[in-house]
Design a protein with these regions (language model features):
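Short strand-turn motif at the edge of the Rossmann-like AdoMet-binding core
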Residues: 93-94, 119-122, 148
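N-terminal Rossmann-like dinucleotide-binding module
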Residues: 1-46
Length: 233
């Protein structure tokens, strides 16, 4: 794999810390003028092949895969351009802001025989595979509950009127898209598509800072709790 990384955030640093354990031939990174210093710092620290501040330059290079680690609302736009340039795409969660965007990306990838996937690894963990294979042996569930709640480091700024992407509804922020998506992914991977879904959220300044998603599977219910305004016990 010849990998092109979009972004310089914490999640990118996490990936780069394990990059030498992966079958990756070369790495290039795309930053912005605003993150220029950080981009060059990462480029040097992890001995990358090149760094870029122009997406077209990166797409013209010999990379074969693009990893999209940008704010949620940018996933679709940058992934689409990568696919149209015949690059495989790995996208951080949530893969897109809505279903219509995802359908279009899948269509393009299928037409060009490319791979597109969301960077959620729970499906590949041995413990998850064991759980899925033995779920019927455990017995029929009645209530399945998952909780991913952590007090966001950006929440205090949000309360003071500083709206960062993680709390901006125009940029696909909020508890559902940022945290609860992990719970939903886990439940759907185990049990498939629910019959009915209901989301009840705590709304502050037009964004869900926390919420409960109820998934109805007829014979049992799944409850997904996600919060950025408080933490779980």
């Amino acid at each position: 794999m010849k990998l092109g990384i979009l972004g310089t955030g914490i999640i990118v640093k996490d990936l780069l810390s394990t990059i030498n354990k992966l079958p990756i031939e070369s790495v290039e990174i795309l930053g912005t003028e605003r993150s220029k210093e950080k981009t060059i710092e990462l480029y040097k620290e992890y001995n990358m092949k090149a760094y870029h501040f122009d997406y077209d330059d990166l797409l013209k290079s010999d990379i074969d895969t693009v990893y999209v680690a940008l704010p949620n609302h940018l996933h679709y736009e940058f992934a689409k351009r990568a696919l149209e340039n015949d690059k495989h795409v790995i996208i951080e969660k949530p893969i897109t802001s809505n279903y219509s965007e995802l359908k279009e990306l899948i269509k393009i990838a299928s037409e060009r025989n490319l791979i597109i996937l969301e960077a959620v690894n729970v499906h590949y963990l041995p413990a998850f595979k064991e759980l899925k294979s033995s779920i019927l042996e455990i017995g029929k569930p009645k209530i399945v509950s998952l909780n991913y709640s952590q007090y966001s480091s950006r929440y205090d700024s949000f309360k003071n009127g500083i709206i960062l992407p993680a709390f901006d509804y125009k940029k696909s922020g909020g508890a559902l898209m940022d945290l609860n998506v992990y719970n939903i992914n886990f439940i759907v991977s185990l049990f498939g598509k629910p019959k009915e879904v209901q989301y009840m959220a705590n709304i502050e300044n037009k964004i869900d800072t926390s919420g409960i998603l109820l998934m109805d599977y007829n014979e049992f219910k799944a409850v997904c709790i996600g919060a950025k305004d408080c933490k779980a016990p």
